[in-house]
């Protein structure tokens, strides 16, 4: 299965910059699956600019409710209508800045699945939690609280909703720091074991992305690690050439 390279633009990007970015991606054939998650207002313009290129689009959050009197919230159904196929949920910046709990992330994931979106559920520990030896415990608790039953096929018998996990150590996001390869491999193995326990057969194959200061210079070594099914890329996804370089590193794996 090709690795997934997902770009999280966060609150960056402009309408004026869409054309050049899309032009760089359109002819590319890196061998990895590409997903770009721009700010919600840019999803439809970027979709149009990509002009059918094999690049999926995603959102960075969605609301628990599908519609109604919820000022400022993002409807999962509307995101799908705009062209999104995926949605990032539970990113550490959302958990910290908006006090989102794992229970809220779980409800958002249910809503996303109902709207036909694939949830990318983020987990990760702080520097203090890693230093105190609690990293795996914290991440397992986030998984236990954030993953809906739909991902195990427990809601509609025989129907397993697709989902993706993204492990992002909080202290590595945007800092230029990355954990050691041994630490990444150990955490991904721990996540895989937790997914098997929690989701059964579905958990054995669910992709686990690594995120946190992924860049062209370290992508190949990170993407070659066991149980790393791709990358959730932040700052490096804002430049098409860097994003494609990371995708090319995945293809060489």
Swiss-Prot record:
Subcellular location: Cytoplasm
Claim: Cytoplasm is one of the keywords in the record: yes
EC number(s) per entry: 5.3.1.1
Coiled coil: none
Class in the EC hierarchy, top level: isomerase
A biological process from GO: glycerol catabolic process
Signal peptide boundaries: none
Gene3D superfamilies listed in its UniProt record: Aldolase class I
A family per Pfam: TIM
Disulfide bond positions: none
InterPro entries tied to this protein: Aldolase_TIM (IPR013785), TIM_sf (IPR035990), TrioseP_Isoase_bac/euk (IPR022896), Triosephosphate_isomerase (IPR000652), Triosephosphate_isomerase_AS (IPR020861)
Active site: 91, 168
Catalytic activity, as annotated: D-glyceraldehyde 3-phosphate = dihydroxyacetone phosphate
Cellular component aspect of the GO annotation: cytosol
Major localisation: cytoplasm
PROSITE patterns assigned to the protein according to its UniProt record, in alphabetical order: TIM_1, TIM_2
Binding site for substrate: 8-10, 174, 213, 234-235
Example of a GO MF term: triose-phosphate isomerase activity
Pathway: Carbohydrate biosynthesis; gluconeogenesis; Carbohydrate degradation; glycolysis; D-glyceraldehyde 3-phosphate from glycerone phosphate: step 1/1
Task performed by this protein: Involved in the gluconeogenesis. Catalyzes stereospecifically the conversion of dihydroxyacetone phosphate (DHAP) to D-glyceraldehyde-3-phosphate (G3P).
Family: Belongs to the triosephosphate isomerase family.
Protein name as annotated: Triosephosphate isomerase
Organism ancestry: Bacteria, Pseudomonadati, Pseudomonadota, Alphaproteobacteria, Acetobacterales
